[in-house]
Amino acid sequence: MIPICPVVSFTYVPSRLGEEAKMATGNYFGFTHGAAAQYSQQPASGVAYSHPTTVASYTVHQAPVAAHTVTAAYAPAAATVAVARPAPVAVAAAATAAAYGGYPAAHTATDYGYTQRQQEAPPPPPPVTTQNYQDSYSYVRSTAPAVAYDSKQYYQQPTATVAAAAQPQPAVAETYYQTAPIALSLPVAPKAGYSQGAAQYTQAQQTRQVTAIKPANPSPATTTFSIYPVSSTVQPVAAAATVVPSYTQSATYSTTAVTYSGAAYSGYEAAVYSAASSYYQQQQQQQQKQAAAAAAAAATAAWTGTNFTKKPQFQNKQLKPKQPPKPPQIHYCDVCKISCAGPQTYKEHLEGQKHKKKEAALKASQNTTSSSTAVRGTQNQLRCELCDVSCTGADAYAAHIRGAKHQKVVKLHTKLGKPIPSTEPNVVSQSVTSAAVSKPSTTSSSTSGANGSSSVGASPSVKLLTSSSSLSTSSSSKASSMSSTSIVKKVTTPKITFIGGNKLQSTGNKVDDSKMSDSAKTTPSTAAQTQEAKIDPMSEAAQTLAALQSDVQPVGHDYVEEVRNDEGKVIRFHCKLCECSFNDPNAKEMHLKGRRHRLQYKKKVNPDLQVEVKPSIRARKIQEEKMRKQMQKEEYWRRREEEERWRMEMRRYEEDMYWRRMEEEQHHWDDRRRVPEGGYPHGPPGPPGLLGVRPGMPPQPQGPSPLRRPDSSDDRYVMTKHAAIYPTEEELQAVQKIVSLTERALKLVSDSMADQDKSKTKESDDKKEPSKERALKGVLRVGVLAKGLLLRGDRNVSLVLLCAEKPTRALLSRITESLPKQLAVICPEKYEVSCSLAEAAIILNSCVEPKMQVTITLTSPVIREENLRDGDVTPGMVKDPPDVLDRQKCLDALAALRHAKWFQARANGLQSCVIIIRILRDLCQRVPTWSDFPSWALELLVEKAISSSSGPQSPGDALRRVFECISSGIILKGGPGLLDPCEKDPYDTLATMNDQQREDITSSAQFALRLLAFRQIYKVLGMDPLSQMNQRFNVHNNRKRRRDSDGVDSFEAEGKKDKKDYDNF
C-alpha cells in the first residue's frame, strides 16, 4: 500500500502545458475535463509541516453560503499532518479530527464547503483534501520517504486577493462550489481505490451510497466564510511578518460531508465546474489586482527556511485574464420530468404539445378547489408524485410502480441526484396545492438576490441541478444566509437553464445541535413541519387504500392467451373476449379485474356475473328527469280526481244546507207571525235547526261546513266517515218538525196559562196586588240540537222551558195536561205526552216513523240566583214550595243553556271543530271505553285542541291533534283537567270519571294514534278502507305490505286478521 500524504495538491493533466502555464500566469484557475486527482499518503509518522506562518486560503468558486468544516472524508486513520498553519490551528484541527471514532491521529483538513442540492444527480465529489498555496508553482515535496505523486506536476494557486474568497452566491445556485480552500482540478473519473491505513474506500460498487458524517465542532481557528463579507483584514500571527487573511462571518455553519462510491459523470461535472470557474473569474479580477503583491510577499515569507524551492517569477505579473469559456447549458424540464440534450431540443420541447398540456394540467390542478370543481372520483385516486400521474386503484398503482415509465423516471432522477419520493401511494387530496409553474426561461442567465431566502422567494420555481443526493448542506446554507446582515449584492449565475417544478423539498439527515446557531435553527424546524405535514396524508392514504382495494376477483383467465415469438419468449398478451393486446405482464391481472373485461365476460360467457353499473352523468340526469315528470303527472291526476270528488260532495252538502235553511227560515217566520208582541220575554227563539242560530246573529253553517279540500288520506277518511254519520234528510225533517211543533205548542200553553191567570186576577178583590208575570217565559234548544251535533240515528233532542218561579209538580202537571190540547190544534197528528217527575221534564214522543222524542226540562233562573246570593238572606231562610221539582235537574238545565251559548260563540265557527266532535261522539257510542267520557268535557277538549293550533286544521290533522292531547295524559288523575268555562267557581268537567276510566281512555287514544301513524285510520273510525279511485295509484298505498293472497283483497284480509285486535274501534 502506498501511503498518502494529506497535504495534496490538485493539478491538470498536461494536455496543453503552454495554455495551462498561461492560465496560471493570468490568475485563471480552470478545470480541465480530463483531470484526475492524484492522491498519495505518507506513513503514520509522517513529517508534520509546522511553519510560523500560513498562506491565505482562497475560494476558487463563488462562495455559496457558509464555510463548512469537513473532516477528511477520505483521510487516513493514522496520519498526523499539520498543514502549514499556525499552531493554534493545528491543535484545533487535531482536536476536531480526534472527535471521530476510528480517526485517532490528529489529522486536520482545510475546511471545505459543499453546498448540495437534492434535486440533481450526484457525480462523485473529489475527496476532501488539504491544499497549500505556495509562492511558487511547484508541488509540495515532503522530506519523508515513500511520498509518491505519480510523476505528475502539480500547479499551486498563487496568492490572490483576500476579499476574493468572500464573494456571495445565491442560495438557489447551490452546486459543488466549495467555500474554503479548494482543489484546483477536480476529478472526472476518480481512482478506483483509495488505500488508507485504517479504512479502505472503494468505488467498485455502481450503486450510489451517501454517508452523512457528523460535522465537527467549530474551533476559533477554523477559516469560515460569509456570503456578505464586510471586509478582509490582514493580521500578523507569529513573530515573523506573516499575513493571515481573516474572513468574517456572522454565523459559523457546518454541514455533513458526503462520501460517494459510484460511477462518475464527466459531462455534467465538467459543465458545472466550468460554469463555476467562469463566475469566479468575473468576480475576482479587481480584488486580485489590488492585493496580489501583499499576498505574494506573505506566501514567500511563509516558506523561508525550508527545503522547497520558491520560484516567484509569476507573482508580480498582472496580465489580462483570459475570458472564460462559454459554459454549457443544462436543460431539465421539471414539469415533464425529462432532460434535454441541448437548447434546440429544449426549446422544441417547451413549444411542444406535450409540455403545454402538462403545464396546463398542473395549473388547472392548482386552481381547482376542493369542492365543486373537483373531478368526480379524484378523492379515490392514488397519485405517484414522482411521475405526477394518478391511478384509479391499488392494482393500477402497483402496476405503474413496476412499469417501464416509472422505472425510467426513477433512473433519471437517480442520475440527476433529485429526490425520489417514497413508493407508498399518495391519496389525491384537493387541499394540497402545488407551487405556481413558472414560464420557461429563454434568457441565457437568471439573476436572483444573494440572500438565500430572498432568492428562493423571488424565483421559487427555479431548480438547479446538483450532483448530490443529500440536502443537508442546502438547508444549512439557507439558514446561514438568512442570518447574514451584510451587503446584499446581486450576482450573475452561470448559464444553466431550467423549467420550474412544484416546490423545493429539503430533508436533512442529522444535524449536530452544538453546531447550530440561533439563526440556523429555523430551517430544521421548517423541515420538521414539512415532515409532519407529510405524515397526515400518508395516514389518510393508508386508510383510503383499503377502500380502493375492492373485492373484485379476476375472471376469464382462460381467455387471455400468451403470444410468443419464434424463440418461445412471451412478447404480449391477447384477450379474446375484449379483442385487445397488451405487452405488460403487470397489466394482465388488472385487465382481468377491469370493468370492460368483466362486462364482456358477462355478455359472452356468464350472464350471471355481477358488474357494477356506472351510468354516465347525462344518463342519470335523463332518468331522474323522466321519473320526476312521471311523479308530477301522477300527482296531478291524483289531485284532480280528489278535487273532483270533493267538489261533488260539497255540492251535495251545499244543496242540502240550502233547502234546509230555506225551510227553517220559513218555519221561523211563520212562528214569528203567530207569536204576539212580547210573547217571549227573552226574545224569540232561534230558527229551528241543528245549530239554533237566532236571526240577529250571523248565520252559522249547519252540517258539514265548507272546508278547503283535503290534502291527505286521513282527510278523505274523516270526511267520508262524517258523511256516513251525518243524519239523513228524513231524520232531519222529523227532528225539525217535532221540535217546531213542540215550540209552537208550548207557546200556546204559555198563552193559555197567562189568560187563565189574568181572569183569576180580575175576579179577586184585592186590587193592590200587582199582576204577576207569565209562568212560562220561553223555551230554548239545548244539547246536540242547539250545537248542531246530531248524528244519524239520534232520536232524542232536548228543550228547556224557562219558568218565572221555581218549577213545581203542579206546574209540571198543568203543562202536561195542556200540551196535548195545543198540539191537536196545531197539527192533526197524534203525539204522546208524558210527565217525568224524576227528570223534572215533560217527554213528547211522535207516533209516526221515524219516531222522535223531545225532552222538555223545566227550570228557572231563580234557582241559580239563590245560590249566588250573598246578602243577609241565606238559602235556608227562603221558603220553597212543598212540591218543588228536583233542584239539581233544574240546575243542570240552566248549565245546558250556558253550554249551548258558549258552544255557539266559540266552537261553531271553528274550522273542523263540529266535524271532529261528531266523529268523537260516534266513537263514544261505538267503543264502550269511550262511553264514559262526558260529552261536555269532550267538546271543551276538541275546541281547546283545535283553537290552540297555529292555523286552520284539516279534519284529519284536527283528529290527530285531539288524540295527541288525550294521549299526553291530560285527562289522567293529577293532570291539569278540564275546567268548565261556564262556571264562576273552578269545576273540573272530568270529575265524574274514576281513575280506571281515565286510564282506559288515555290508552285507547294512544292506540288510535298509532293506527293513524300507520295509515289505519279507518280502523279508528270503524269503517271499511276506501277503494282507490284509479288503479294506477295502488302502488303508493301498497308499498308497506304486499297482498296476502291473490283472491282476497289486502285490506279485507287485514280486516279479518286484525278484527280481534281492533274490536274496540
Swiss-Prot record:
Q: Which Pfam families match?
A: DZF_C, DZF_N, zf-met
Spell out the Low complexity composition-biased ranges.
Answer: 427-461
- PANTHER family, from UniProt? ZINC FINGER RNA-BINDING PROTEIN (PTHR45762:SF21)
Where does the record place Polar residues bias? 364-375, 519-532
Q: Recite the UniProt keywords alphabetically.
A: Cytoplasm, Developmental protein, DNA-binding, Nucleus, Repeat, RNA-binding
Gene3D superfamilies linked to this entry: 1.10.1410.40, Beta Polymerase, domain 2 (3.30.460.10), Classic Zinc Finger (3.30.160.60)
Please provide, in alphabetical order, the Gene Ontology terms of the cellular component aspect for this entry.
cytoplasm; nucleus
Residue ranges annotated as compositionally biased, kind Basic and acidic residues, are: 667-676, 755-773, 1053-1065
* Function, as annotated: Involved in postimplantation and gastrulation stages of development. Binds to DNA and RNA.
In this chain the DZF domain maps to 694-1064
Where on the tree of life does the source sit, at the highest rank? Eukaryota
Instruction: State one molecular function term (GO).
Output: zinc ion binding
Gene behind this protein: zfr
Q: Is the keyword Nucleus in the record?
A: yes
Q: What is this protein called?
A: Zinc finger RNA-binding protein
Task: Output the SUPFAM superfamilies linked to this UniProt entry.
Answer: beta-beta-alpha zinc fingers
Give the species.
Xenopus tropicalis
Against PROSITE patterns, the record matches this protein to: DZF, ZINC_FINGER_C2H2_1
Please give the residue ranges the record annotates as the region Disordered.
114-133, 351-375, 416-461, 467-486, 499-533, 667-714, 752-773, 1032-1065
Q: Where is it located?
A: Nucleus; Cytoplasm
